[in-house]
């Protein structure tokens, strides 16, 4: 997989990462719906423990919503945070109403599977989709959300960096290495919180100064 490309290769990597998202109880991947549902269930359980409200009361529902929106609103200041928060709100409302169809559409959006804004607007009422240009921003949003949902954060594992090494076009290779540099800098500078990134490649695809990772001087100076 590539991290950047002219034909949606970066988005394809994002789709694979989200499709394979795993937890201890769902190690085989496909855990996104489980994570979202458990988050809402945990908020409901916490609300019940903190109050004498009955789960079927309007007051209980309002107390749960207050906690849900506290998490959602805290993401608004991040890049694309408002849109991400809006989708979380749609998911929560669908969960509360037992609307599995809308839940499925929101998960489809989170997975980056809407090809056009028109399609997303028609099905969800939102005029934005995840693209090759901004997919990494949504990874950062997911990591922040996961922290607030009770997890330690997100650990991303990307193997086969040799696929970037094999890209014949030098400019395209450089764009991919630039994306790695962005990730590296973000984690060190605190712009990407609660996220760990492990990338693997052969010694040659890392150390080759002609076309490997070390061919991008800004990376070589940091990693060598």
Language model feature labels by segment:
Residues 100-224:
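The catalytic "switch" region of P-loop NTPases
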């Amino acid at each position: 997989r590539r991290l950047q490309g002219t034909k949606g290769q970066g988005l394809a990597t994002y789709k694979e990462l989200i499709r394979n998202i795993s937890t201890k109880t769902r190690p085989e991947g496909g855990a996104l719906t489980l994570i979202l549902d458990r988050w809402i269930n945990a908020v409901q359980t916490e609300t019940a423990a903190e109050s004498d409200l009955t789960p079927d009361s309007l007051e209980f529902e309002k107390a749960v919503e207050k906690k849900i929106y506290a998490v959602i609103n805290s993401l608004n200041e991040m890049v694309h945070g408002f849109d991400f928060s809006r989708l979380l709100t749609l998911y929560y409302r669908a969960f509360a109403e037992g609307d599995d169809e809308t839940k499925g559409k929101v998960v489809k959006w989170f997975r980056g599977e809407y090809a056009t804004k028109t399609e997303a607007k028609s099905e969800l009422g939102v005029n934005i989709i995840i693209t090759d240009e901004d997919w990494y921003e949504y990874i950062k949003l997911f990591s922040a959300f996961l922290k607030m949902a009770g997890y330690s954060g997100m650990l991303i594992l990307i193997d086969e960096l040799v696929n970037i090494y094999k890209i014949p076009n030098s400019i395209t290779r450089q764009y991919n290495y630039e994306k790695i540099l962005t990730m590296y800098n973000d984690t060190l500078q605190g712009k990407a919180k609660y996220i760990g990134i492990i990338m693997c490649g052969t010694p040659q695809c890392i150390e080759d100064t002609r076309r490997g990772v070390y061919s991008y001087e800004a990376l070589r100076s940091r990693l060598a």
